[in-house]
């Protein structure tokens, strides 16, 4: 490919004055697929579909608000001067870690209100969340955001990427590292790992699937974040997501080890035990 063409149109559909962005379409598609998978996983673990749907109805708005709030806080120098853009979430600018914090709070409160084991629900959610993250990164691709440092055309061609993807990585007068793609692939590999190992019920105690997800995602995010040029910064020195990734990686592994040795009441998963666990806690 020798000719640089125009970037892909971020608008999927125009209905009069209404514009439907690809970013929103991709995120919405990721949510729909994740919900369907969560319901199936919930039934396998003995959690009623109604409980899954109710939790998601609460979690979605709070997740979105938390993800946007997190982003705005660390970009406050800009949004303080442009407050009208705070709500323009369709232009991009949501932080995954912020969304995970918001979703985690909702899950904990919801499970306590329904007497459902929190770790069980987090285990159900983990594969669906990382799959949604992997799909959602393509929204960043359409918006030409979450890209990396300047690279060469020959490097991108050496990755055997299609021309349309390479062309979209021509941003601000230079080709960029497709960090969105690296993270998307990492997330989908994590999804495959969790889906394959979740059947190994003798490996996991409740919460281990979720903690494995946290460690996996944090490990990959640390490296992809180091290649990005649009990182949220703390004191203009520390990449917020890298610092948080270190804490989450070591924290999740440490917590998994601690719970195995110091929390004997934490259940091992046994084949067919999901319904029994939920019933006992209700």
Swiss-Prot record:
GO terms for cellular component: plasma membrane. A 1,2-diacyl-sn-glycero-3-phospho-(1'-sn-glycerol) binds at residue 137. It is a multi-pass membrane protein. The keyword Membrane applies. Pfam families: LGT. The chain crosses the membrane at residues 18-38, 56-76, 89-109, 237-257. The keyword Transmembrane helix applies. GO terms for biological process: lipoprotein biosynthetic process. It is an enzyme of class 2 (transferase). Keywords: Cell membrane, Membrane, Transferase, Transmembrane, Transmembrane helix. One of its GO terms (molecular function) is phosphatidylglycerol-prolipoprotein diacylglyceryl transferase activity. It comes from the Bacteria. PROSITE patterns: LGT. Pathway: Protein modification; lipoprotein biosynthesis (diacylglyceryl transfer). InterPro entries: Lgt. It is found in: Cell membrane. Its EC number is 2.5.1.145. PANTHER family: PHOSPHATIDYLGLYCEROL--PROLIPOPROTEIN DIACYLGLYCERYL TRANSFERASE (PTHR30589:SF0), PROLIPOPROTEIN DIACYLGLYCERYL TRANSFERASE (PTHR30589). Belongs to the Lgt family. Catalyzes the transfer of the diacylglyceryl group from phosphatidylglycerol to the sulfhydryl group of the N-terminal cysteine of a prolipoprotein, the first step in the formation of mature lipoproteins. NCBIfam families: lgt. This is Phosphatidylglycerol--prolipoprotein diacylglyceryl transferase. It comes from Lactiplantibacillus plantarum (strain ATCC BAA-793 / NCIMB 8826 / WCFS1) (Lactobacillus plantarum). The lineage of its organism: Bacteria, Bacillati, Bacillota, Bacilli, Lactobacillales.
């Amino acid at each position: 490919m020798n000719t640089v063409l125009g970037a892909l149109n971020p608008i999927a559909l125009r209905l009069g004055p209404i514009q439907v962005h690809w970013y929103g379409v991709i995120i919405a598609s990721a949510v729909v697929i994740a919900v369907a998978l969560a319901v199936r996983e919930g039934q396998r673990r003995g959690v009623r579909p109604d409980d899954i749907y109710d939790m998601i109805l609460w979690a979605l708005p709070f997740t979105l608000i938390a993800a946007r709030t997190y982003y705005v806080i660390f970009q406050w120098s800009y949004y303080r001067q442009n407050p009208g853009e705070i709500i323009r979430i369709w232009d991009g600018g949501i932080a995954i870690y912020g969304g995970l914090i918001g979703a985690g709070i909702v899950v904990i409160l919801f499970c306590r209100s329904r007497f459902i084991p929190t770790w069980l629900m987090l285990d159900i959610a983990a594969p669906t969340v990382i799959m949604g993250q992997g799909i959602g990164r393509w929204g960043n691709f359409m918006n030409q955001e979450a890209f990396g440092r300047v690279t060469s055309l020959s490097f991108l061609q050496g990755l055997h990427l299609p021309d349309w993807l390479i062309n979209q990585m021509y941003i601000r007068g230079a080709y960029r590292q497709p960090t969105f793609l690296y993270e998307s692939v990492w997330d989908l590999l994590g999804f495959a790992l969790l889906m394959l190992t979740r059947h190994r019920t003798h490996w996991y105690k409740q919460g281990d699937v979720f903690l494995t997800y946290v460690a996996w995602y944090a490990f990959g995010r640390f490296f992809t974040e180091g290649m990005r040029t649009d990182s949220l910064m703390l004191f203009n020195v520390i990449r917020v997501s890298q610092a948080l990734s270190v804490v989450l990686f070591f924290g999740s592994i440490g917590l998994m080890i601690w719970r195995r040795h110091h929390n004997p009441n934490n259940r091992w998963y046994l084949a067919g035990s999901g319904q029994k666990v939920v019933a006992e806690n209700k």
